[in-house]
Each structure stands twice: as structure tokens, then as C-alpha cells.
Amino acid sequence: MSDCCSAPGISWEAGVGRPAVPGLELQIRRGAMSEETVSESQFSLKTAALRVFDLPLTWYYSLSQIKFSPVAKKLFVVTAVSAISVIFLAHHFKRKRGKKKGKILPWEPEHLILEYTKRAASDKGSSCSSSRQNLTLSLSSTKDKGSQVCNYANGGLFSKYSGSAQSLASVQSVNSCHSCACGNSNSWDKADEDDIKLVNIPVTTPENLYLMGMELFEEALRRWEQALTFRNRQAEDEACGSIKLGAGDAIAEENVDDIISTEFIHKLEALLQRAYRLQEEFEATLGASDPNSLADDIDKDTDITMKGNVEDFGLRDTLSIASTDSFASAAELAEHREVRHTYSLESLCHCPFYEEAMHLVEEGKIYSRVLRTEMLECLGDSDFLAKLHCIRQAFQVILSESANRIFLAESGRKILSALIVKARKNPKKFEDVFDEMIYFLEQTDHWGSTEMELAARGVKNLNFYDVVLDFILMDSFEDLENPPTSIQNVVNNRWLNSSFKETAVASSCWSVLKQKRQQMKIPDGFFAHFYAICEHISPVLAWGFLGPRNSLYDLCCFFKNQVLLFLKDIFDFEKVRYSSTETLAEDLMQLLIRRTELLMAYLEADALRHTSSCLSSHGHVMSTGLLEAKVQ
């Protein structure tokens, strides 16, 4: 039996049951230990599963009886390792993706700001306009939607004066980008830190500080314009009966009529007009040139002022002001200095005389033959009509004094006579008919017929502005800007000499006046005297504006510019006071005297230049004659 049960090559010790081979005993012991280890590991896994998943006790006994095959064990291990690897890779890619998000992409707004800032910093000769462009270009990608809502939702009545929403947003985007970059500086690499430094360089330059100030000023203008146009928008949208003003957590609801009163609108219009003037001065002083050259401009202005105070003002200095541009600019500088110290913001905002006129305009009681709103830079037709009503009453106060009437008549005679003399004509006949016209207007018996004649032409107010400035001067300037085709053909014909062209222009003017004389209803009325004056002055003005660019042309242009500037001044809150009739009349008279003095000074300088040229030519002829006599 022992032979059957024993394996070949193995002998058993009697009574012990141990194999005779010692190495086999060691292998059996190791196998037993490995089985115990596997069972213990299975037990520990089962215990961990029970603890983690909180399984019932019955599940424990069922789990203890489950046995996995080696293939299942391998699949379980591979699945666990794969799951852990996938989780690790997902976490790794998520961190990498977050880092990429922190960096600025080339098409993102911040990168646009940095690129344009680098370009502005690298260009040494960049001017004020280029820096403005660099700042505003960043808006197109950062504040596109916000600016569109702001611009289109609020209406654009005053959009021609400022487009400040985009410009301000561009400056804010630069500042916000700079602050955010500094706050997250730990997540930026070295190249990005260099970009942040480049952003800070141009913002702190005087040029860009000036631009930022202008952007904020334009933003204030835009807000005031929105406030002024709010009533029009509210009328279009009647559903919005009230507005909400947020102040922290509190919301106040007030009626629109209580917030935007008529007095507030008038004060806001005055403030806006002052702001527009200030904006134009900024652009004229610094906008078209480099701000670094402002000191040079100030030095030049100082030199002009110092030259004006020198007592020994020789012939050469006198002749230097004969040109229209230099003389007008110097006069405007002096005038601006005087006005700057005369009026304050309080006087501009408090204009009861103007407010009363605005009430009359709202009631439809003010009439004007021609609305010159845009030409005189008024805020609207209502603003123009209200100021016109005040100006009419002020001129009545001025003309009520005989000294003022004499001054206006003498000034008109001198200026128009100088134009005729400049055209190489004799002003004697003109002065005679001019005196007859003044005598006719002084007779009160003719005022009724004069009023009827002017009313037939649309002039319903016998006033210095309506008759002289608007009907006579401004209409004449407009007619000369668009002359008849026949006159244009004669003037533009290169085969005709200047004398023939001048005669043709004069003949055309006389033929037009002859036709108008035939249509007169009163043979010796206002228009009869007026056409008699036009027979002498109209050909001179027509040839002066349409003829060659000579000294007569310069004089006519200077005369026209002074009239236009005077009209703009009297419709400007900065130059005149609309607080009362007396103050407005005083300011109008001062402006009349100033413009008249400028014209007279120009005429004297031109006459002096003409005299000096004649003397120089005469001296040259005399010296040539003496030289010839010596040679003989």
C-alpha cells in the first residue's frame, strides 16, 4: 500500500508522515505561507470595503465566500491603475489650461493695449494725435457693446461736438489693465512684466496726461448733452414717466418735470456753450500740435505782447500787422485776455433776461426772417431766438442815444469809403448818398413807410441787427458767395484782362440794381436811398471778393471776418452778459467799438504800407535819375 500511495522517488519516515527529501519540505512550507498571505490580503480588502461602503454583516459573509480568478484579479488591477492615471492626467491638463488662460492671447483686448502701447513707446516722434489714436484703438475690443448702448440709446442731438464715450473707455481700459496686471503679478512671466512696464510708461507722460484730461472733459460734455436731450427722449417714450436715481442701496423715484426744469435747462445750455468754447480753445492750442511745443507757443505770444508795449514802434513793425491773419490773431489774443477776467461762471449761469426771452420763444412770440443757428454757433433754434430777442432790445437802448448813432454812422462811412478808395475810386459821391440816407433815417415821418417796405421783404423789426447786420451785410455776403453764372464765366475767363473783368462785374451789378429799382413801390423811400448806396459799394465788394487775390481782396475778407466775429461774439455767453438789457447793451457797444478800432487800425496800416511803397519807388526813380545825370 505504501508503494501505491507513495510517489516515485519519495520515501516517508515511519510514524512521522514527513517527506524524506528536505528541500521539498521547505517548498511546502512556503506555499502554505503564500496561501495564508493571500487569504489575509483578501480579508483585509473585504474589511476595508465593509468600512468604506458600510455594508451589512450578511454581505460580509457572502463576500468572504467569493473567490476571484487570476484573470479577474489582473483586470481589476489594470482598471484601477488606468482610472488613477486618467484622473492624474485630467488634473494635470486642467492646471495647464488655467495657466494658458491667465496669459493674454494676441487677439484679446489687453494684448491690443500692450501692442499699441509698445508701438507708441517705440516711436520717438509720436505726436498728440498719434497718442490719442493709440489710446482709442483699444476701445474697439474692450468696450464695444457698452459704448454702442451708451451712444445709440441716448440719442445724438449733440453728437457732432463730442464722441467721448469711446475715448474715455479706452483710458479706463488702460488703467484697469494696468491695475489687474499688478494685482496678479505672481502669475505673469518676465515678458508679461515687461509689457506691464510699457503700459505705465506712456500713461505717465505729459502728453498722455493731457489726453486723459481731455477724455474726462469730453465725458463731462457727453453727460451734459444727455441731460439736455433727456426731455426730447422722454417725449418720444411716454411710457417712461419717471426715472430712478441710484445712490448706494437707496433708490429714489422723482418726476421728470421736477428734475429737469426750464431754468435748469437754460443754465445747462449756458454751461455747454462755455464748455464748447473751452474745448475749441484746447484743440486750437494743443490739439493740432505737440504739447511739448506749448512752451514755445507761449514764448511767441509773450514776444508779441512785449512788442505791443514798446513805445518805439517803427515802420517795419507797423507794416508787419498789415496781413489779415497776423493782425486778427493778435487782436483776438488781446480780446481773449480782457474777457477772461471780466466774466465769471456765475454770471454765465444766472441770466434772467435770457430766461425771460426763452419763455417767449416757447410761447412762439419771437420771429426771425432767417435762422442763423449754426453760423452763430448757437445750441439750437430756441437758443438763437431767445438771444436775438435780447439783442434787439439792447440795440434799441444803444440807438436811443445820439452819441451812439453818430458813432455808428461815422464808422460806417469811414470803412466803406476806405473800401472804395482801395478800389481806386473816388468816394465823394458815395459819401453824399450815404449822408442822405442817414438824414432820411433820422426823420421820424419816414419810419412808417420804411417799416412797410422792410416788412414786404420779411424784415418785421426795425432794428440795427435785423436791418443792417442781417438784411444788408449778411445777405450781401451770401450773394457774393454764390454769384450768377454769367459773372463767374467772365471772372474765370483767362483771355480777358483785369480791367475788362472789373467793368463787366460792375455792369452786372448795375443791371441788377436797375431791375430792383423798377420794382420799388415808393420812389423816394428807404430802398431808393439804399440802392443809391449800393450803386457805389456793390461793384467794389463784388470785384474785391471775386477778383484777383490782392490787397483789396484782403481788405474785403478782413471786413467780412470782423462782421462775422462780431455776430458770434454778441451771441456768446462768454463775451456778453444776458443778465439785463442795460448790461447787454453795454457789452454790445464795447464790442462794436473794439471791432471798429480793429478795422480802422487795419486800414491805417494798409495806407501806411501803400505810402511807404510809393516812397520807396519814388526814391528809386530819383536815385536812378541822379545816377544818369552823373553819367552824362
Swiss-Prot record:
The keyword Transmembrane applies. This is Mitoguardin 1. Regulator of mitochondrial fusion: acts by forming homo- and heterodimers at the mitochondrial outer membrane and facilitating the formation of PLD6/MitoPLD dimers. May act by regulating phospholipid metabolism via PLD6/MitoPLD. GO terms for molecular function: protein heterodimerization activity; protein homodimerization activity. It is a single-pass membrane protein. The lineage of its organism: Eukaryota, Metazoa, Chordata, Craniata, Vertebrata. PANTHER family: MITOGUARDIN (PTHR21508), MITOGUARDIN 1 (PTHR21508:SF3). The chain crosses the membrane at residues 70-90. The gene is MIGA1. It is found in: Mitochondrion outer membrane. Belongs to the mitoguardin family. One of its GO terms (cellular component) is mitochondrial outer membrane. Homodimer and heterodimer; forms heterodimers with MIGA2. Interacts with PLD6/MitoPLD. InterPro entries: Miga. The keyword Phosphoprotein applies. One of its GO terms (biological process) is mitochondrial fusion. Keywords: Membrane, Mitochondrion, Mitochondrion outer membrane, Phosphoprotein, Transmembrane, Transmembrane helix. The modification Phosphoserine is found at residues 289, 293.
